[in-house]
């Protein structure tokens, strides 16, 4: 009787044992990750690789990744990875930054995989992290409370002087404008413009430094023999980074004269060569208007230098006459997405034309002469006329050709 009872219990227990068996348990037991890694090819790519196996065919693999950057809402990117389905698979995907744009050195990227088999079992792997480092150089580092300098050529004194220049620029921005770093900054010092451009994706030939505000990182080219320029360049890029962090999440952009003027202010006194250009332009009443340099600077090198000098002068005019609190208020209004004119009207009571008139008056000048020097349209009147004539001739040629074809 006892034997019969035991057999009956085993009979009814079999379905339960079947349900609890490894072959039918949670998805984690259905799909196994053999390996997962990522390899950086700085500065152009990162390749993510996965090997996995399952009791049934693996049908779908997605990769999700998220660079460590400042954002209003953490957002990850998801990629449907191509691979050959099977019970044991190898999958890989390369993030081609020549297509998407690059990342600064030192950026950390979190990534994880989502795997599904043909039976519908799914797993998500735990997050891994890859650091996107430039391994071409043997980096040293030196830091303060807010800034860390990374460099590979030059002695410790070289790095100390650059670090001091960065700290002084931050103090200047805090005292004169009222803006400060939202998070510590990393500054990578490349010893030449060639080395710097080799660390960037599609750099401009004239690029001397770049501030990656969302990543709180600056990359810049400074040789030990060009320390004076390097100090100014670091201060300038820090100015951009701090201001952009201040208006982070804005719906619009800053006028170029304000963005560059604040960065120039971070450097300290205006460079003597730029001051000379500004003085000459004032003497000949040959200044660009505020509106002219609001959207972009001229491409001509000398006109661009004058635009930088004017931007510095404009920011100094606003600070000297209205105080740093108003500059900070102006940045706050721009953060809300206000237009250039509306922001100035809200904070100061005048628009760009009004600012232009008051600034010129402070320099001893009358109303803005027209036209302003070196129009920034980039195309002179004779070329515009030539383009119009060519366009008209082209239209006439097409018209007569079609008319002739209809007669045929």
Where are these regions (language model features)?
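Short, hydrophobic alpha-helical membrane anchors of single-pass surface/secreted proteins
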Residues: 379-392
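Juxtacatalytic substrate-recognition/specificity segment
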Residues: 138-251, 255, 297, 307, ...
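Glycan-association/targeting regions that enable binding to alpha-glucans and other polysaccharides
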Residues: 23-139, 148
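Bacterial N-terminal signal peptides that target proteins for export
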Residues: 1-8
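Short, solvent-exposed loop/turn and secondary-structure capping segments
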Residues: 61, 124-126, 161, 198-202, ...
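Ser/Thr-rich, Proline-interspersed low-complexity disordered segments
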Residues: 14-27, 146, 364-379
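Acidic/His/Gly-enriched intrinsically disordered linker/tail segments
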Residues: 206-217, 222, 228-233, 245-379
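C-terminal membrane-anchoring or membrane-association module
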Residues: 390-408
């Amino acid at each position: 009787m006892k034997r019969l009872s035991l057999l009956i219990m085993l009979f009814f227990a079999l379905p339960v044992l079947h349900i609890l068996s490894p072959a039918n348990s949670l998805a984690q037991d259905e799909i196994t990750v053999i390996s997962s890694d990522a390899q950086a090819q700085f500065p152009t790519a990162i390749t993510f690789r996965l090997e996995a196996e399952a009791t049934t065919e693996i049908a779908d693999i997605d990769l999700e990744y998220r660079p460590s950057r400042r954002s209003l809402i953490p957002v990850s990117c998801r990629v449907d990875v191509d691979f050959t389905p099977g019970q044991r698979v190898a999958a890989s995907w390369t993030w081609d930054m020549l297509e998407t744009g690059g990342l600064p050195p030192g950026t950390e990227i979190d990534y994880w995989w989502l795997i599904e088999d043909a039976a519908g079992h799914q797993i998500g792997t735990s997050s891994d992290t890859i650091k996107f480092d430039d391994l071409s150089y043997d980096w040293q580092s030196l830091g303060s409370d807010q800034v860390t300098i990374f460099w590979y050529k030059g002695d410790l004194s070289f790095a100390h002087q650059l670090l001091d220049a960065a700290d002084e620029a931050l103090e200047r921005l805090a005292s004169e404008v009222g803006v400060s770093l939202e998070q510590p900054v990393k500054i990578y010092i490349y010893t030449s413009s060639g080395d710097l451009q080799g660390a960037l994706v599609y750099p401009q030939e004239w690029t001397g430094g770049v501030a990656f505000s969302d990543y709180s990182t600056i990359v810049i080219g400074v040789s030990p023999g060009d320390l004076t320029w390097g100090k100014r360049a670091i201060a300038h890029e820090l100015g951009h980074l701090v201001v952009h962090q201040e208006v982070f999440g804005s719906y619009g952009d800053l006028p170029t004269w304000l963005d560059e003027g604040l960065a120039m202010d971070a450097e300290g006194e205006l460079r003597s060569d730029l001051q000379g250009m500004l003085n000459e332009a004032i003497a000949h009443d040959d200044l660009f208007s505020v509106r002219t340099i609001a959207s972009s600077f001229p491409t001509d090198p000398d006109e661009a230098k004058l635009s930088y000098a004017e931007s510095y002068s404009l920011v100094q005019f606003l600070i000297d006459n209205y105080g740093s609190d108003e500059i900070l208020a102006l940045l706050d209004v721009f953060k809300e997405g206000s237009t250039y004119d509306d922001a100035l009207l809200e904070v100061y009571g005048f628009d760009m034309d009004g600012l232009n008139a008051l600034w010129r008056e402070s320099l001893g000048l009358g109303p803005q002469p027209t036209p302003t020097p070196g129009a920034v349209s980039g195309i002179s009147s004779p070329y515009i006329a030539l383009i119009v004539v060519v366009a008209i001739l082209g239209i006439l040629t097409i018209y007569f050709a079609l008319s002739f074809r209809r007669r045929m």
